[in-house]
Amino acid sequence: YLKALYLGAKYAIPHLKSGDGGIIVNIASIHGILQEPGRFVYESAKTGVIGMTRQLATEFGPDGIRVNAIAPGHILVERSAQAWKKNPTGHKFVSNQYPIGRTGTPDDIANGIAFLCSDESSFITGHTLTIDGGLTVQLQEQFGVKQAQYIIDNPDTNLSD
């Protein structure tokens, strides 16, 4: 995964340098910010995306190239929407993890990318914009209690889908 980002930057940067600069937005994940046991490769790669973003911003900022990343939480795309329709209590369980009470949509991500590519963010580089409905800002102690209560109240919840 990091090789793809490296190669993309390697071949894009000469073109961006020859013009008026440009913008690169990498896709990381909240798993690059918070780690979960058993996901060593994925989470190491996403942490690497954040590091690579910062390094590229440092290296190529003087050339007028801004480099940022986004770190999405759970995003409800067509495939996952179909799976969650079969498992509404499981989806509610996941949605309850987010302080705003829902999972993200592709539009949430597109809006973040559009902002990072806009003039409104012209002084932002090397930043990872977390788009996660507040998941990464909450203390986990109360979150665990809330989720346990949900399972008690909804014993038929299927968490394997």
Predicted segments — roles?
Residues 9, 45, 53:
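Active-site helix of classical SDR
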Residues 35-44, 55, 79, 83, ...:
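Active-site loop-to-helix junction immediately N-terminal to the catalytic Tyr of the SDR YXXXK motif
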